[in-house]
Amino acid sequence: MRHLLDFQDVNKNHLENLIEKTRSLEFKSENIDSLALLKFDEPSTRTRLSFAIAAEKLGIKTFESSDVISAKQKGEILKHEIETYISMGIEILVLRTKENNIDDYREFKDIGVISAGFGNKSHPTQALIDISTLFSLNKINEKLTPITYIGDVKHSRVFESGRQLLNLLGFKVGVFTDKNLLPENKNDLEIYESWDEVFESSNAIELLRVQKERLQDNEEINFDEYINNYQLTQEILGKSQSDLAVLHPMPINIGIEISKDAIDDRKIKYKDQLSHAIPSRIAAFKYLRDEI
């Protein structure tokens, strides 16, 4: 069975079909009659709920688990864990984890694995949401960088998957952030030094929260300085183009990446992203079943 761990093994045709399915906003009920395990080892609201609803729409029965209540607490290895799921008829594993051992899951052939957020490595269905939103808002322009990510790109799986997806479509992405939050791999990136450069080069931006839970002991962030330089405020929005689209994968930390006076501006499009949440997860399930 296929996996959707990231976009490494997804060809351009399949990727375009995934985007089209996500853009369609379809909620058509089906009766696939399959079993899926939603294993979330990190907190989640939108991702977990939208996967559960998407499965329900497709007739996929879901069960839930996490490392806290699994035999991993007793030392069970991954191979035995997956063999157990397969023996019980689980065909799809939807996994959210803080770990980065994504390649270990590529080896499994009798169960399809979807990344619902994999360490700082991948979050493919969120990337589908974000880029589908941009297409729906007509923000993909070959003359411009489709999107500039602002904030903690170093630790962001949303950034990594968005970058990978857009690279497959032939685009570079922009970055505007503190030097300590730049990714190690800077290939195919446009690195901007000011808000003015961002607005001159992109039709859309995506704000990313500082991932405090992933900061290492040797990574220090001066939050006062960060907020002063990279927080999106109403004043800064007023200097942007009238048709700018501002995305955010959520949860939003008001007062850090965006000010309270800016959150309700008409340019803020997180509600458009939310409308694509269930369709993106429907698309992921269908991709695993070779229906896309």
Predicted regions: what is each one?
Residues 41-56, 135-209:
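Glycine-rich phosphate/diphosphate-binding loop of Rossmann-like nucleotide-binding domains
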Residues 32-135, 254:
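Phosphate/diphosphate ligand-binding glycine-rich loop within oxidoreductases
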Residues 186-261:
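Rossmann-like adenosine-cofactor binding region
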Residues 30-36, 143-147, 243:
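Phosphate-coordination loops involved in phosphoryl transfer and adenosine-cofactor binding
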Residues 243-244, 250-292:
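Adenosine-phosphate binding glycine-rich loop
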Residues 1-49:
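Positively charged, low-complexity intrinsically disordered leader regions
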Residues 58, 108-110, 169, 187, ...:
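Short, structured coil segments at secondary-structure junctions
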